[in-house]
Amino acid sequence: MQSAATIDRFRPPMVIRAFNRFGAMLNGKVSRRIPPEELIETAKRRANLDDFGDGDFREPLGHLLESCWRDARLNAIGTIALRSDVLRILRNRLLLQRDRSLHPEIAQHQIRAPLFVVGLPRTGTTFLHTLLSADPASRAPLTWEVMEPSPPTNAEKQRRIRRASQNLACLEWVAPNFGKLHPVGAELPQECVSLMSPSFLSDQFDTMYNVPGYRKWFLQQDLQPAYEFHRRFLQHLQERENGRRWILKAPTHMFGLPTLLAIYPDALFLQTHRAPLEAITSVSSLITILRRVFSDTVDPVKIGAEAISYWWKTLAKFIGERDRLAPERIFDLSYLDLRRDPISAVRRIYQHFGWVLSPRAENRMREILAKQPADLHGFHRYEAAQFGLRPEHEQEFFGDYCERFSVGSRVSTRPVQLTSALHQSRFVRDGLG
C-alpha cells in the first residue's frame, strides 16, 4: 500500500529526473567545483560594476561553495540553481552598493521598532507574516523586490514582478505543488533571512542544500556582518516607501538575538508556539522535499536529527535571552489560537503593542483569509518516524518549553500515532508555514 505521506508522493517530474541522470553521465563536467572568484568575476562583468561595498563576503562564500562541493551531492539542477542563486546575490550586492553611492540619503533611513515574527518553523509564522503585513500601515519585504531590489524606486516595478514570477515558475516546474506546502509568489511577503544572503552568512543555503561543513562553520561566526547587511537592505527598500511599520519574519532570528538587538535596539517580537515535535517533523518534511529538487541523495532521518538538534539549542538559547526584554516588547501566540480565530489573534497582537487595527486593515486581512485554499491544512502530511523522530523526543528536548508555554503534541503519550489537535489521523497535516 502506498504511503500517504507527502515526501513519498513528492518527486521531481520525469523530465527533470532524466536531465539529472544525463548530468550525472557527464561525470563531473556539470557538477564541477565552482571557485568563488569565478562567480565574483562573472557577476562583476555582467553588472559592469566592481564595488561590493564594505564587509568580507568572500570567506563565507568560499565555505559555502566548498561545502556544496564536498557535502551536498548536487545533481545537474542543483548545480545550475546554486550557480544562478550565487550570481543573482552577488549582482544584487553590486547594484545595492551602486545605488547607495548614487543616493547617499538611503544610508540615513531609520528603521524604527520593526516587528520580528519568530518561533519554531512551521508554527504559523508565514501565515501571520502575510496577515499582519496586509495592514496599509505596515509593510513586509516582498519577494520581487528582494529578488531584484535595484533601482530603489518603483521604476520598472511591473517588469520586475513579471521576472520574479517567471523565476518562481521554474520552481513550480521542477517541484510541482511546492506552493501548497509553502506559499510562493512574486508579490507575497518574503522571509527576511534573504536580506542577509549578500553576506553569505545565512541559513537559507542550509535549507536548500545539505551543507554540514558550511553549517558547522556558520554556527560559530559573528553574525554582525549579516545583520548589518540586513539593515542596509531594509534601508534600500525603505527608499521606495518610507513611514510604514516593518513586519519581518524568520525563525532563525532566534539564533542571533543579541546581534539583532545591537542593530535594531527597539525591535519588537512576536513568538508563535506549537507542539515542537509536530513543528520539527513538518520542517523536516519540507526540507526533504526541497533538497530532493537539488540532490538525488537525500536522507530524511539525517535531516530530522539535524533539525531537532539545531532547533532545540536555538529555542533554549532564545528563551533565555528573550527574558531580558521588557514584557511589552514581546507577545506570545499559540499556533492553535491562530488557526481557530486569526482575526481575534491579530486583535490581541495589536492591543499588546498599542497599535490601531483600522477597519481597512481588518478588511484586507479578511480578504486574505477568504482566499485561503480549502485544502490548505490537508495537502502536507507527514509522520515523525520517517525522520527518525520518536514520541519521547518532545519531552526529552523540549519539556521545559512545553510546560512554560502550554504546548505539546499528543504524540508524546501515544507511541503509535502522531496526532495534531485538529486532525485525528495517522498523519499530521498543516498549511500555516
Regions found by a protein language model. Give the residues of each.
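Flexible, glycine/threonine-enriched loop-and-boundary segments that flank and lead into catalytic domains
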Residues: 233, 239-266
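Post-Walker A helix-loop "phosphate-sensing" segment adjacent to the P-loop in P-loop NTPases
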Residues: 134-144
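Conserved phosphate-donor/acceptor-positioning beta-strand/loop module used by diverse small-molecule
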Residues: 249, 260-285
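PAPS-dependent sulfation machinery
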Residues: 145-246
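Short His-Asn-centered micro-motif
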Residues: 118-120, 247-251, 335
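Glycine-rich phosphate-binding P-loop
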Residues: 116-135
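Pre-Walker A adenine-sensing motif
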Residues: 98-108
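PAPS-dependent sulfotransferases, especially Golgi type II membrane carbohydrate sulfotransferases
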Residues: 1-98, 210-227, 237-241, 283-433
